[in-house]
């Protein structure tokens, strides 16, 4: 049964994301800590079927995720949109060039719902830059269950053999 928009708002979206990653066979999550991601990372770390790898910079995280994926392990990358903006060269010359199907779960800062002055410029350019990099991406729809959206993004990455960035709101990932 498909849930209504109101029912979707009652579901704990971060738990649904975590359950979906496990159900889809993800075994590694590479992350750069962010204010929105902190508690989510704690829950990933507590999952026996998921290995959390913390990186210090987004381009480093991308390289680690691609390396783990090269080893045959289904991998998700968890970063902030500002970090993806800084990893353009690695995205084009590594992840896209060698067709790594990496699911990128990206906290989307600087939107009208996150109108903090220093995030706003990053929010305004995120999607145009992703388009310019030919980075496949989508924003989550808060009125639809998040699990199927994560699954659709992961499936696209696999089928197209490319990274896919799913842009997440605060309610999607804040525990």
Please tell me what each predicted stretch does.
Residues 2-175:
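Thiamine diphosphate
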């Amino acid at each position: 049964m498909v849930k209504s928009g109101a029912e979707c708002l009652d579901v704990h979206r971060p738990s649904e994301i975590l359950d979906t990653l496990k159900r889809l066979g993800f075994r590694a999550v590479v992350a750069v800590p962010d204010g929105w991601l902190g508690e989510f990372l704690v829950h990933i770390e507590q999952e026996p079927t998921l290995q959390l790898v913390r990186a210090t910079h987004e381009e480093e995280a991308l390289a680690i995720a691609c390396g783990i994926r090269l080893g045959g392990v289904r991998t998700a990358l968890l970063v902030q949109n500002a970090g993806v903006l800084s990893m353009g060269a690695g995205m084009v010359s590594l992840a896209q060039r060698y067709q790594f199907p990496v699911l990128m779960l990206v906290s989307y800062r600087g939107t009208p719902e996150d109108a903090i002055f220093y995030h706003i410029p990053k929010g305004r350019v995120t999607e145009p830059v992703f388009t310019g990099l030919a980075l496949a991406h989508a924003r989550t729809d808060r009125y639809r269950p998040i699990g199927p959206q994560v699954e659709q993004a992961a499936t696209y990455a696999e089928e197209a053999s490319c990274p896919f960035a799913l842009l997440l709101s605060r309610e999607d990932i804040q525990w």
